[in-house]
């Protein structure tokens, strides 16, 4: 998703949905395939349809509202990805790995919610 999040077309669409301009990269978390499926099935996503730009085709993505340890975020489920269904890609306004001082192997709480709301600043 990093390549996509660097593109203004995705940034604009995600900002329109989430209210924040996403950092151009994702925090990738691993869970069980069943847990990911069960959690995401409980909330509605907002769909970004696939599109063409400068002769290239770009994948659609389902965007789910979430919070990661107090920070507004979005779970991104790309139609085309290098990861399996057990990997969750999370976009946020900031680089969550640095903001939350996350190390490989850390357990992270992700709350998937029913709607996006702005972070208070």
Give short role names for the model-derived ranges.
Residues 92-98:
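Short alpha-helix capping/helix-loop boundary micro-motifs
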């Amino acid at each position: 998703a990093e390549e996509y999040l660097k593109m203004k077309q995705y940034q604009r669409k995600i900002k329109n949905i989430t209210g924040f301009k996403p950092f151009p990269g994702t925090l990738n978390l691993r869970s069980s395939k069943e847990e990911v499926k069960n959690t995401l099935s409980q909330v509605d996503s907002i769909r970004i349809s696939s599109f063409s730009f400068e002769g290239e085709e770009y994948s659609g993505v389902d965007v789910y509202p979430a919070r990661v340890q107090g920070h507004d975020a979005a779970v991104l489920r790309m139609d085309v990805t290098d990861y399996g269904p057990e990997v969750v890609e999370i976009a946020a306004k900031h680089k969550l790995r640095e903001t939350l001082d996350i190390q490989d192997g850390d357990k992270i709480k992700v709350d998937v919610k029913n709607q996006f709301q702005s972070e208070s600043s």
